[in-house]
């Protein structure tokens, strides 16, 4: 234990953790750049419905869910570095599929199919990337710093969303979807090169419980995470169309407001889950998320909507590390990658289910209704978290 403790405090370990987080930022631009553009591309350029928009966005997360188990086993048994680098390469392939969708002279259904293929590849890549980098980071700095590892990764992810959303809209409006796709293809390859020399961490040995027994240990924090995820899913999927329907500009900056507030909270308060425990931090965070989504639901102007998006980002920021601290406490070291992958899968399921369901709700009741649904989910998340951990 002493050796581990000393290792976790070395500057070299922290610098390696920074390199991993920066690579996550570069790779996750593959998600951030096209996120506000894909709904516009599917709805306006290909002429498909809101439900198809939801499918195009949400199907990525189903692919992530279905490959989380593989990603966890890969990280646990063969090394987290391999999982992370493999994920970066897959994310680059997703950009290649979108480039084909943009350049090939084919019909709208074929373009949509290529878009879906790219989203599926991206989902596979994301599961390898995030499971690998979380397990890699824990191996570098130790499980007592699990909140720090999750906070740094989260800052990278949502920093990429904050920067990527307006940049993606800018690239698309000036240079077209092909330029956007090419950019998303190159950035993960740069990340791969940047992380190539970061040292490996050894795979843990020991008896490995079954996946279902691991799920039995993590489902309570996972359920709270899933209910939190509805809020981000409705913003990521429908905020561009919501702004267009109201005649508002600055749609891309809603994700900047969300991501900026998210990152700021991680910088200022990312230490809280390690210090105070996950449950208290998660409950307060869900309250803030609820307030932000209610503002989006009722927003009379674009500026109020931006404030709502920022509040939602601030609320979502600490929930993953807060409840993730509880996951790390519950599982043995040799299945930590599997447990973190399974935990993140709850959020992926939430994202995947929310897209098409919210699309049907938006068609029936209008775009504001999806933000009300997100707020209700966050309130349910508060109740589930309080009741689950009180009984536990």
From Swiss-Prot:
The keyword Protein biosynthesis does not apply. GO terms for molecular function: transmembrane transporter activity. Keywords: Cell inner membrane, Cell membrane, Membrane, Transmembrane, Transmembrane helix, Transport. The chain crosses the membrane at residues 22-42, 46-66, 97-117, 121-141, 151-171, 174-194, 224-244, 252-272, 276-298, 342-362, 369-389. SUPFAM superfamilies: MFS general substrate transporter. Its main location: membrane. The keyword Transmembrane helix applies. It is found in: Cell inner membrane. Coiled coil: none annotated. Gene3D superfamilies: MFS general substrate transporter like domains. It is a multi-pass membrane protein. Belongs to the major facilitator superfamily. YfcJ family. NCBIfam families: PRK05122.1, PRK12382.1. This is Uncharacterized MFS-type transporter YfcJ. The gene is yfcJ.
